[in-house]
Structure formats: structure tokens, C-alpha cells
């Protein structure tokens, strides 16, 4: 297949090609011209490049991507999505793993900034930790797409920001949790990384909802930096400090952490007394909601954010002018009614 060739992915190789996990291969190519036209780019150029190849954006493009760390399933899903859409649309994606570490990601982005790209897309592990190399790339005329979290609190010339409403996500999933425990009891919040704007928003949403439930008491709120091993250690300590009957609920800033805590709680034989919720609606968490081991999760649409970054970055690299500075990418609270459909959309790299 053309996706394995060195000369780039061509739309003609994918038009009409359908398989179980990739019905989008034909549809994605067919829709790019309308995206380009809507953003003021030349739709005819999208169909045929200067060499006669039918690349989605007139020529093969090279992009660099980085998110917080592939140890998080949300980030791993995003990587798979960006690479898959890149193959469909003729964008060669090079990945720089953030390693769930400010220092690791900074070194990766410093290296990224030494090279030339058609566009880059970044989810920062911590706010204001990548400003200098990102400004260096912007100064070279490279469009920078910001994904999910804020790179800089100042305006440094980011092309656009694809972001979910983290406050809303934290609020709605916390409300579902408190309803599950009847509006009363003790809760623990396990945070992500304190410098991560997504985690900050989810914490704010949690506290907004907590204020509406006077009979719910917050026992502890500690960061685990998205690290499931830190989560396990924290919750082992909580279960010792707060004996049976003293914890009714746990809210986690992502699903990986919620599921890690669920294992610790189950090993202690306390799974029936503590309700848990997470954020991201990754497939294992959606299944956990369906089987009752999680009380809820809310979708942070990793696939939509990452394929959006591929498409919008390519638009910016090929002359689109009216790209908005902010694009909201919200997802729903997961219920039994929508779970199967959401899983299907994730499997197709859409949601």
C-alpha cells in the first residue's frame, strides 16, 4: 500500500478503501478539499500537487508532534490517531515523547526546534516550560498548534488552541460521583500534574461542584503527576489512614489513575464502599463504567484533538488564513446509552 512507500501517501491509493478499523481512509481524503476551501486555501491545489500526485494538501508535509507522555493512554491514543491521519492525508508525523516529565519534554522540544517542519503540534506537560523553543519555531515561520493544555500564559503567536473545557469535565464527572454516593460522604481527589492546565481546570471543576454538596467532605487532594505507581502508593496510604467506612468516593484527573486506584481498593476488599470516577473516557474506563467498577468518566476527545491538529496544522502550512485562535473540543459524560457509540468512534480515530 502507498502508506508504506517513501514518496508519501497519495489520496488515489485510499479513495474508497474501507476496512474494519479504517473506513475513514476514503472519507478523510474526500473531505479535505472542503476544509481547505472553508479556510481560504486553494481546493484545486488540495487535489493535485505540482508533480501531479494527488496529495491532500498538494504535496507531502512533515510535522512534529509531542504530547505529555506516551505512558498515559490518552497520549498514546493521540499518537496513534495523528500518525494514522497523517498517513491518510500525506503528512509525515515525527513523534517527540514528553515522557511525563517537564525536563524530558523540554529536551525533546529543544531538539524539535533545531529542525525544519511544515507545522508542529504540542501538548505541554507544564505551562511556561517550553516557551523558548516554541518561540524559536514560530520565529522561523512554523505554525504551532497547541493541544489540550496551555504552552504559555502569554500570547506568543500560537496558530490555534484545540482544548476541551477542563472545568466542565471536572464538574460534570464530580456531580455524577456525588449523586452516586447520595450527596453525602467523604471524597479524595487525586490530581494530575500541578503545572498542567488541564489538571488545574479539572480541579477547579471539582471544587465548583463540591461547593454545591455541603454534606460531602474533602479528605485529601494530592498530585500523582499522571503516574499510576504514585497513585497506587497514595491510595495504599489512604486506605491505612482512613479505615473501612471512612472513604466513600474518589475523583481522578484521568482514567489511568482511577483504574490504578481501583486495583488497590479491590485488593483491600473495599471496592463496594468506594465509588470512583475519572476523566478521558479511554476504552478500558468506558468498559469499567459498563461493568460497574467505575462510577463514571467523561470524554476528553484525544482523537479529535490530534486529528484536528493534523488537519489544521496542514491547512496553516498551506496558506489558510482565517483559522480561529481557539477551537473548543468537548466530549460527553459517559452513560450506558452512549458508551457503545463512543467506543466505536474512538476505534475509528474520530472522537
For each predicted feature, which ranges?
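N-terminal secretory signal peptides
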Residues: 1-18, 29-38
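Extracytoplasmic "Venus flytrap"
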Residues: 52-81, 85-89, 94-111, 115-117, ...
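Hydrophobic alpha-helical segments within soluble ligand-binding/sensing domains
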Residues: 57, 105, 161-187, 200-201, ...
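Short, solvent-exposed amphipathic alpha-helices that sit
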Residues: 74-88, 169-173, 197-216, 230, ...
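Flexible loop/hinge segments that line or gate small-molecule binding clefts
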Residues: 128-168, 179, 186, 192, ...
Amino acid at each position: 500500500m502507498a502508506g508504506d512507500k517513501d514518496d508519501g501517501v497519495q489520496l488515489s491509493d485510499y479513495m474508497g478503501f474501507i476496512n474494519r478499523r479504517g473506513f475513514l481512509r476514503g472519507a478523510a481524503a474526500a473531505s479535505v478539499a472542503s476544509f481547505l476551501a472553508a479556510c481560504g486555501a486553494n481546493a484545486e491545489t488540495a487535489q493535485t500537487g505540482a508533480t501531479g500526485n494527488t496529495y491532500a494538501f498538494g504535496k507531502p508535509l512533515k510535522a512534529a508532534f509531542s504530547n505529555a507522555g506516551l505512558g498515559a493512554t490518552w497520549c498514546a491514543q493521540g499518537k496513534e490517531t495523528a500518525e494514522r491521519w497523517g498517513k491518510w492525508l500525506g503528512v509525515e508525523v515525527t513523534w517527540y515523547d514528553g515522557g511525563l516529565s517537564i525536563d524530558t519534554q523540554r529536551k525533546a522540544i529543544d531538539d524539535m526546534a533545531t529542525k525544519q517542519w511544515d507545522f508542529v503540534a504540542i501538548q505541554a506537560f507544564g505551562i511556561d516550560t517550553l516557551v523558548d523553543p516554541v518561540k524559536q519555531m514560530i520565529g522561523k515561520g512554523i505554525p504551532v498548534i497547541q493541544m489540550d493544555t496551555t504552552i504559555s500564559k502569554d500570547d506568543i503567536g500560537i496558530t490555534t488552541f484545540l482544548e476541551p473545557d477542563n472545568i466542565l469535565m471536572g464538574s460534570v464527572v464530580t456531580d455524577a460521583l456525588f449523586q452516586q454516593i447520595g450527596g453525602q460522604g467523604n471524597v479524595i481527589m487525586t490530581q494530575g500534574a500541578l503545572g498542567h492546565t488541564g489538571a488545574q481546570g479539572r480541579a477547579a471543576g471539582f471544587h465548583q461542584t463540591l461547593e454545591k454538596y455541603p454534606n460531602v467532605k474533602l479528605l485529601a487532594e494530592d498530585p500523582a503527576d499522571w503516574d499510576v505507581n504514585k497513585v497506587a502508593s497514595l491510595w495504599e496510604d489512604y486506605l491505612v489512614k482512613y479505615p473501612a467506612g471512612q472513604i466513600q468516593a474518589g475523583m481522578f484527573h484521568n482514567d489511568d489513575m482511577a483504574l490504578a486506584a481501583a486495583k488497590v481498593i479491590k485488593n483491600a476488599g473495599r471496592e463496594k464502599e468506594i465509588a470512583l470516577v475519572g476523566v478521558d473516557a479511554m476504552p478500558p474506563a468506558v468498559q469499567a463504567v459498563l461493568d460497574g467498577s467505575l462510577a463514571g468518566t467523561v470524554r476528553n476527545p484525544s482523537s479529535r484533538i490530534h486529528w484536528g491538529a493534523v488537519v489544521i496544522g496542514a491547512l496553516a502550512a498551506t496558506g489558510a488564513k482565517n483559522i480561529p485562535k481557539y477551537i473548543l473540543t468537548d466530549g460527553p459524560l459517559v452513560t450506558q446509552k452512549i458508551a457503545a457509540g463512543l467506543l466505536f468512534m474512538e476505534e475509528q480515530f474520530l472522537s
